[in-house]
């Protein structure tokens, strides 16, 4: 396996060096007798920066779905009142509806 890898690397390096040598040998050097052309204008492209979002606390990011937690909590009752609310409820019996005199 190592031999195959070594052969592949050697072949790739050999091809790239041969291609580089061929490229440099065939490119003629520019002659100095040509007149200089005006340099091309370079255009500078400015990047458009987006406004940074407002920073939030980490807890606000995690719990943004719990909007119900901000509502007013119900009144707290004593523990005994919670347990015995049904036993000691003083409900008055329903009065019959007053009948109009006919």
From Swiss-Prot:
Instruction: Point out the propeptide residues.
Output: 22-58
Compositionally biased intervals (Basic residues):
80-90
UniProt subcellular location: Periplasm
GO CC annotations on file? periplasmic space
After translation, the protein is modified as follows: Proteolytic processing gives rise to the active protein.
Which ranges are annotated Low complexity under compositional bias? 22-41, 91-102
Q: Where is this region: Disordered?
A: 22-102
> What are the record keywords, sorted?
Periplasm, Signal
Cited InterPro entries: Acid_shock
Q: Where is the signal peptide?
A: 1-21
What job does the chain carry out?
Required for growth and/or survival at acidic conditions.
Protein family according to the UniProt entry:
Belongs to the Asr family.
Put simply, this protein is called Acid shock protein
Query: What is the gene called?
Result: asr
